[in-house]
Amino acid sequence: MDLKNWYDRVREQLSRLDFPALWAGFAPCPFALYTHDTAVLNGEMMPRPAEFYGNTSVCRQGEHLAIWDMEADPPADVAGLAASLVHEMFHSFQFRCGEQGWPDDLVLAATEPQPAFLALRAQEHRALAGGAPLSEVLALRQSRAALQPELLLEEARMETIEGTAEYVGRLALARLSPAACEGACARSAQRLLQWPDLRRGAYDSGPWLLRRAAEEGLPVPVHPGGEPIADQLARQLSLPEVRLQPELLAEAERRLERERSARRETLRALLETAERTEGDFAVCGYDPMQLRAQDGLLWSGSFLALRQADGTVRRLFGPCAVRLADDPHRATALFVPRM
């Protein structure tokens, strides 16, 4: 893979964007593309830095960077890659602005939604994808708040952090390749109809909330400052009464049972051959897209970092699991497949 060529073409695409026009105060930051052993940053080739993992924003030598793993997520085209890097640059912008409302991935992974919560969310997603007024969407959201407010808060924070970054990335894509953006929005609407998990769904519900707000002429806060954007939008609207559709509740119950069974089978297969280590561990690193929890166990599919009692950090790659303490950020046992 010619990393330098990709880098130069992405840099040219980014130079075409007016960043403050995408979001007030937004400015680009340096970006890097990398493979398992090589990276390009500021136009220079180098060995892959140890802190480069995933597609995200990282702080390296006191500077926020947007990074992209070209092997794990090979781009289809340069405009799409540039828009994805705008998403990651927006996270750097959020850090620089002092954003406080970061979601807790471990709470999201460890908390199972109630059937009614999940069904109302599916109804909300259908309203978003179908073009319903924002007041109807947020009235359904308000109904969920009465069921599991702590879980909804983490989802709404995810929507604010990741959904806003995704929205800004799509605005960039609309300027670089309008046809590609139209396709991305259509696929996003379809994903909302497919009962996505709480984390993944926020990447799609967030942009649609912001798009609908723009269409309805509602002001959106430039720097949320910790309060979810959905809450700030709801205060500007009169919310109607809404009712849960019974068929969605029945479907939610079926889906939850299937998901429980699948998680239990995944954990059973791992525990059958795993070596168990007792201890006091703090979960300090993970791939948030590869976390599943069931019956007090947290499964990780790709990467997990645990701070041990002596202060050292143990890094695990590949499937493993931990038994969670009452606090989902701590674990009392580690299960790693025997080699």
Give the positions of each predicted feature.
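Non-catalytic terminal regions of proteins
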Residues: M70, P221-M339
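A metal-dependent hydrolase signature that marks the N-terminal structural subdomain at the beginning
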Residues: M1-G80, T312-M339
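Surface-exposed polar/charged interaction patches
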Residues: R16-P20, S143, L239
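Alpha-helical scaffolds flanking conserved acidic
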Residues: A79-A83, E182-A186
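Alpha-helical structural motif
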Residues: W6, L120-E124, T164, S205, ...
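Active-site-proximal alpha-helical
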Residues: E150-A179, A186-P246
